[in-house]
Amino acid sequence: MSAADANQLQESLEKLNLDSAPAAAEEEAVAAESAPAGEEGADSANVAESTASLYVGELNTSVNEATLFEIFSPIGQVSSIRVCRDAVSKKSLGYAYVNYHKMEDGEKAIEELNYSPIEGRPCRIMWSQRDPSARRSGDGNIFIKNLHPAIDNKALHDTFSTFGKILSCKVATDDMGQSKCFGFVHYETAEAAEAAIENVNGMLLNDREVFVGKHISKKDRESKFEEIKANFTNIYVKNIDLEYSEEDLKKLFTPYGAITSIYLEKDAEGKSKGFGFVNYEGHEAAVKAVEELNDKEINGQKIYVGRAQKKRERMEELKKQYENTRLEKLSKYQGVNLFIKNLDDTIDSEKLEEEFKPFGTITSARVMVDETGKSKGFGFVCFSSPEEATKAITEMNQRMFFGKPLYVALAQRKDVRRSQLEQQIQARNQMRMQNAAATGGIPGQFIPPMFYGQQGFFPPNGRGNAPFPGPNPQMIMRRGQPFGGPEQWPRPGPNGQPVPVYGIPPQAYSDFNGQNIRQQRGYYPNRNQNKGRQQRDLAAIIASAPPDQQKRILGEELYPKIVATGKAQEPEAAGKITGMMLDLDNQEILALLEDDELFTNHFEDALTAFEEYKNSEAAAPVAPAAPAEPQA
């Protein structure tokens, strides 16, 4: 487009009221206000004629008013254009309204531009129907199915336009733009629709026999569904011998009544797939065939015979069956199924059952294992009664078993556990905010232990000083990571200060002492030196640590994870949020550390509480400063 053309287009757009073309709901109000009382029938048509409003559909979301003006303005003088957009996101809904001053220009636009590509996608143009009753009326609307995938909107329009004036025409497509092999044609008159049904129904279009009939709204179809269901004539047959032909199937079902059609599903090679359909003339014959032939053994295998169902109906029934089975299973095991964790790796299902057998009758016991058969450290034991399960919880929870304290509780679904944790932390956040309002601050700030040394080096011992102490929660690595490179230890805290982490096994201590001098000079231990050494499980560490140290250990795990989110920007934010989250039970904190999604949810709640506190603190009135005393 030349510069002159661009300037002319810009000037034309400025003259247009691009927002004056009302959307569908607004159009109805405009039409209603324009028509005088008592003359609605004739005058509503006059309003439509005077505005010459066109609906333009199937548009790309990138199409805007300027693009449409460039396409439609050569036809005639455009009065207004509007691309309809989402009220919130302002993204195009894929359709627009173009208004001409003259009716002739609108007709010409439909003739010349309908189904023409706009940004690579064929558009669909029709007269705007402002009367909702006319749009929703079934008169003149027909439904076509079993269309060839190659038939698009234009091909469908060209095929059916010979029977009368078409108001709208559309082939249904999926999200990828592929045809669903059915479509709709809306004629101006019911007579044209009847003519199309009479002439095209049963015809071959692109070597496919199509069905053409009156369009029935979804509401009407669903209201008639129960009636059709109760008077079915079509039956489904499966588990048929693969050697059976349609003729054999006909001989089997003919004794029960007159058959209108038989269909046996076959593969690409023409071989039977073992199922098919039989349609009777009357409902009684279909019912009799189902009663007589269902589960009947033919050629050594039982066949299934039942009422034919649509895919949607089958899916709904299967979903209901699954839900009923799930609820039945939940009620069956409610209060009797126990969850046991912190099991030693040597414990198998037999040992677990043997340990819990004294408390009652066990219906099942299982230790969960991975793909290699190695224990995951937890399992389930199901008793025959809730009383036995309660006794087992009372006696076995926190009992030492193979050197590890067991955690025993009633088994819960994952979604239930997550919901409970979320409710607990929300309740605690509310209590914290109330306490903060009462005391003037957020309680429970966690101050992580820090070393103030040169950034990038380990804390120096100094010449002649004693080496670092033994395994200390303030001086050891995160669990599950080898003792290695500079990015692992010390981890950066606020202002670039290194923050100690947790998890060095005791056996690494000898190597640690021997490397102090090298560490002071900027050297780091070999990554692979301690490779293969197992780290102690954090849950076991917490269980074996003194009560006054447990929260500190967990805090050293939470703090770097909170810092790593990058959302705790203020210097004190990470410490205060860590303090909030440390108010949770130890088991809840362990769950947060294991589940990133759960951690994120609780962190966001705590961050919101902290920000609300800061905002309320900032909004509080500040006492005026005392005037400065004059200096001598």
From Swiss-Prot:
Residues 1-43 are annotated as: Disordered. Residues 534-615 form the PABC domain. The keyword Glycoprotein does not apply. Keywords: Cytoplasm, mRNA processing, mRNA transport, Nucleus, Repeat, RNA-binding, Translation regulation, Transport. It is found in: Cytoplasm; Nucleus. Residues 31-43 have a biased composition (Low complexity). One of its GO terms (molecular function) is poly(A) binding. Residues 1-11 have a biased composition (Polar residues). GO terms for biological process: mRNA 3'-end processing; mRNA transport; nuclear-transcribed mRNA poly(A) tail shortening; regulation of nuclear-transcribed mRNA poly(A) tail shortening; regulation of translational initiation. This is Polyadenylate-binding protein, cytoplasmic and nuclear. The gene is PAB1.
